[in-house]
């Protein structure tokens, strides 16, 4: 391929640290914390910066998922491999998310962060959580399944529902594959359209420091550092549990499959910082599609595992749900015996699968779970409403790492992982990646395109 020398040149070029997205986002987050702490009104006024950045990302998520999934499926030789990939992915998601739920349940019972608070449920202001409870009541198994089917194709893309877009994309990819050579012009158009979408992402990501700055300034300005003190034990317990889950559980999975969790975290450090600033793992979805394919996983695997994982493989959210539910019981002196906790676990095995990777979705699922269990006071949600935003950072970070691990593992299970490329990319740490060029690095389209045809002699 004529693009190979270009890729090697790009991967060996280093840039000054102040030009790296990693450094810029760190500085932006620190400045945002300082502004929010010392000038809270100004910090709250900066909220549109964070909201605007997330909206820009959401604007292109649906078309990027569509292009990635359709191109991956339509370009496959054997359609059985798609079903195999999906089956292995769902198996992995169920096993690991169940482990996450169990770990959260065990830790909260051992540490008991809510014990001794002696909160009277009748004194809690439930008005602030009414919207979450209402949204949570809509979370049922049948409703979730029916919601995956869009009313219209346009509606799926207009609403930006990841699972609806994914479902249509899979069906479209299968249909396009059945057309054979007759459908090749459509596939070529989708490949070229994907190039445009990924280049739009390049432009949007240059605004990531501004988005992280605005979101962090608002969070600190609106809730203040003082709000962390009252319920600090729960927060510290949750953060430590998430860290241990990543290092021990995901680390063990990585070791069993021949790579290091620490190198993987280093490789996606820029995406982690973006998530830290915005509190939403969805903000890093487009770049994760890029990074995972560059890491050696085939496009068809990445296109299925990453979007699906954003609803079915939210490890951080799973830990949060069990810990928060039992914490509310402890704080309100609501007795929970082993039967109640098993019931809670079984309900969460289902309800946790409806949590999308957006800010606040975990809280809605928690409201749905408390309503479904019945034994726990729903009004107790008011206890953690003030710190939920701070806990969402740990949830989103753990979710992102969990989906990165899942993609590599599933790709290896189905024989769609280039292990040599995996090791070389992890060894480099992604430190030399200057800018995403899908036509050069991602294999978004197979074969030459007008974009890479004129750039094959350039040095990036």
From Swiss-Prot:
Keyword S-adenosyl-L-methionine carried by entry: no
HAMAP family: C4_dicarb_transport (MF_01300)
Keywords: Cell inner membrane, Cell membrane, Membrane, Symport, Transmembrane, Transmembrane helix, Transport
Top-rank taxon: Bacteria
Protein name listed in UniProt: C4-dicarboxylate transport protein
Family affiliation: Belongs to the dicarboxylate/amino acid:cation symporter (DAACS) (TC 2.A.23) family.
Sample GO molecular function, one term: malate:proton symporter activity
Summary of the function given for this chain in its UniProt record: Responsible for the transport of dicarboxylates such as succinate, fumarate, and malate from the periplasm across the membrane.
Gene label: dctA
């Amino acid at each position: 391929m004529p693009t190979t020398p270009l890729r090697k040149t790009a991967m060996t070029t280093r840039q000054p640290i102040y030009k790296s997205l990693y450094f810029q986002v760190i500085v932006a987050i620190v400045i945002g914390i300082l502004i929010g702490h010392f000038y809270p009104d100004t910090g709250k006024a900066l909220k549109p910066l964070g909201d605007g950045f997330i909206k820009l990302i959401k604007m292109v998520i649906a078309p990027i998922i569509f292009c990635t999934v359709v191109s991956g499926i339509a370009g496959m030789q054997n359609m059985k491999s798609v079903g195999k990939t999906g089956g292995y992915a769902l198996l992995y998601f169920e096993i690991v998310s169940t482990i996450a739920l169990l770990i959260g349940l065990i830790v909260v019972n051992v540490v008991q962060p809510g014990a001794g608070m002696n909160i009277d449920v009748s004194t809690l202001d439930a008005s602030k959580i009414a919207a979450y409870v209402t949204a949570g009541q809509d979370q049922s198994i049948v409703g979730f399944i029916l919601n995956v089917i869009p009313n219209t194709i346009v509606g799926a893309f207009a609403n930006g529902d990841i699972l609806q877009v994914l479902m249509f994309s899979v069906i479209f990819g299968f249909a396009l594959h059945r057309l054979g050579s007759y459908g090749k012009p459509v596939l070529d158009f989708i490949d070229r359209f994907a190039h445009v979408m990924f280049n739009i992402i390049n432009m949007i990501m240059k605004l990531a420091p501004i988005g992280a700055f605005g979101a962090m300034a608002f969070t600190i300005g609106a809730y203040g550092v003082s709000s962390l003190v009252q319920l600090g034990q729960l927060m510290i317990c949750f953060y430590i549990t998430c860290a241990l889950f990543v290092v021990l559980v995901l680390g063990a999975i990585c070791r069993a499959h021949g790579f290091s969790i620490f190198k993987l975290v280093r490789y996606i450090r820029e995406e982690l910082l973006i998530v830290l600033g915005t509190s939403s793992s969805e903000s890093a979805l487009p770049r994760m599609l890029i990074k995972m394919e560059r890491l050696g996983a085939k496009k068809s695997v990445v296109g299925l595992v990453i979007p699906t994982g954003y609803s079915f493989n939210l490890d951080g959210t799973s830990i949060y749900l069990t810990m928060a539910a039992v914490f509310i019981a402890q704080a309100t002196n609501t007795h929970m015996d082993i039967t109640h906790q098993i019931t809670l676990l079984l309900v969460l095995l289902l309800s946790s699968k409806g949590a999308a990777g957006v800010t606040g979705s975990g809280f809605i699922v928690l409201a749905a779970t408390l309503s479904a269990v019945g034994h726990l006071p729903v009004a107790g949600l008011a206890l953690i409403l003030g710190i939920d935003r701070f806990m969402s950072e740990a949830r989103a970070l753990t979710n992102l790492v969990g989906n990165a691990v899942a993609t590599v593992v599933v790709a290896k299970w189905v024989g769609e992982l280039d292990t040599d490329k995996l090791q070389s990319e992890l060894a480099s740490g992604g430190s030399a990646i200057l800018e995403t060029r899908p036509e050069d690095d991602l294999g978004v389209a197979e074969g030459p395109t007008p974009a890479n045809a004129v750039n094959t002699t350039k040095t990036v």
